[in-house]
């Protein structure tokens, strides 16, 4: 029997941090409605609906004007739910899909035209990377987004990441357990990637690799600060809402955003993380914040 991911925190708390116009949440997922977009079979777990409308409510509460929807493992390589969200919110949203080698150029163009700018590769799904697919997606202006956990997986994909054509993105700060420290082989691999000038890292999912079960995940701060110090122009923030496959105390998304005040005390650096860096990576119109704000 599959586990069911608990729903996200339902608190209506707003963040203390006042984000600038154009602020972007660069990592979240949309589930359902399953009546229209059923999950694939087989799948690793189940989840309740966390729809586009739910996401838009969260964006308003956090003060976000834009966002990047990331394909979830619950949909496999069926990007229909993602495509629907992008078409309904073309100014506000961009996407990261999950496609396979057999995808046609026509299908890739359809996804690109809708706002897809990257493809997520999951070590857990397949440790073998299709480099030909990465090269092909590069021709469409997409970047590879690498999702892995721990030192051995980081090392296994190191050469592939460094050989990526153009920009590439690393999920969840590289997901290195905090107990291993800043000098671990895994975290040094992430820093080596950042130093290429082509790597971007998502400041997301601190709960997943912290040794602490609840906010503020204080042991993550040195890792986040080191990533920001190394490449302030190539780090972006993501909520990871609705936090799939998480069975410990559910983090509050407003308080996750507030962690940026500690990770990046300088307001100008936070503005890069939240506005300027996402604009450059995902192709939002420069300086354009979505004026069509949604209300609860």
Where do the model's predicted regions map?
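Mid-to-C-terminal alpha-helical segments outside catalytic/metal-binding sites
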Residues: 1-22, 48-66, 232-234, 247-296
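Mid-domain alpha/beta scaffold segments of enzyme catalytic cores
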Residues: 2-140, 152, 254
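A short acidic, helix-capping loop that chelates divalent metal ions and anchors anionic groups
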Residues: 36-41, 177-181, 209-212, 244-247
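Short, glycine/acidic-enriched loop or turn micro-motifs at the edges of active sites
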Residues: 28-30, 175, 243
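Conserved, mostly hydrophobic/aromatic
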Residues: 27, 59, 82, 111, ...
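Catalytic pocket-lining loop regions of alpha/beta-barrel enzymes
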Residues: 3, 126-237, 286, 290-292
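Active-site phosphate/pyrophosphate- and oxyanion-stabilizing loops and adjacent acidic/basic residues
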Residues: 56, 83-84, 158, 191, ...
């Amino acid at each position: 029997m599959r586990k069911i991911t608990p729903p996200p925190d339902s608190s209506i708390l707003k963040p203390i941090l006042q984000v600038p116009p154009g602020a972007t949440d660069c990592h979240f997922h949309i589930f359902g409605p399953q009546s229209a977009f059923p999950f694939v079979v087989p799948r690793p777990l189940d989840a309740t609906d966390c729809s586009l409308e739910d996401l838009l409510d969260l964006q308003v509460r956090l003060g976000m004007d834009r966002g990047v929807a990331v394909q979830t493992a619950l949909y496999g390589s069926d990007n229909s739910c993602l495509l629907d969200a992008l078409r309904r919110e073309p100014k506000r949203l961009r996407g990261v899909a999950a496609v396979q080698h057999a995808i046609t150029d026509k299908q890739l163009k359809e996804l690109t035209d809708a706002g897809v700018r990257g493809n997520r590769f999951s070590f857990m799904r397949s440790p073998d990377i299709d480099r030909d697919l990465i090269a092909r997606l590069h021709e469409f202006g997409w970047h590879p987004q690498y999702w892995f956990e721990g030192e051995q997986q980081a090392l296994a994909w190191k050469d592939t990441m460094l050989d990526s054509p153009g920009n590439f993105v690393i999920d969840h700060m590289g997901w290195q357990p905090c107990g291993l420290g800043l000098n671990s082989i895994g975290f040094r691999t992430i820093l080596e990637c950042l130093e290429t000038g082509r790597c971007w890292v998502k400041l997301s999912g601190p709960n997943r690799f912290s040794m602490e079960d609840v906010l503020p995940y204080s042991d993550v701060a040195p890792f986040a600060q080191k990533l920001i110090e190394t490449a302030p122009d190539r780090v972006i923030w993501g909520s990871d809402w609705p936090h799939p496959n998480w069975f410990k105390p559910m983090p509050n998304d407003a308080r996750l955003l507030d962690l940026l005040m500690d990770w990046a005390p300088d307001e100008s650096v936070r503005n890069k993380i939240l506005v300027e860096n996402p604009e450059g990576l995902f192709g939002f119109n420069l300086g354009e914040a979505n004026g069509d704000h949604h209300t609860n």
